[in-house]
Amino acid sequence: MNPKELSERELEQLSRGWVQKLYKYLGQLDDVPAPDVNTNGQIMSWMVDEYSKLAGHWTPGTFTGKPLSIGGSLGRDTATAQGGLYVLEAYLRSVIAKNEAIQVSENPLQGKKIVIQ
């Protein structure tokens, strides 16, 4: 399914339906979904709204990526990339400090059995 091909109404129904099906696995102390490819603040708003309806009270901490107007965090839209940059910078500093060469192969996944995003 390509969310870019859905109408706004269909996208909202899909988002709310996803929460309804996974409700019992989500929550502030369990799993807090975050935006990913092809999601945005509107989608996350629908999701937190649906979760809150099911929970019977407002639960802004159950989803990240919400707009600031409903409890989102300033800078969230770039936080993942910024965190990745910090990790890369720390890694490069450690390599330079050890005076090691960085080996890059044409296929860095060759021979690997698992990939973690």
List where the protein language model places each region.
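Glycine-rich phosphate/ribose-binding loops and adjacent secondary-structure elements
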Residues: 75-117
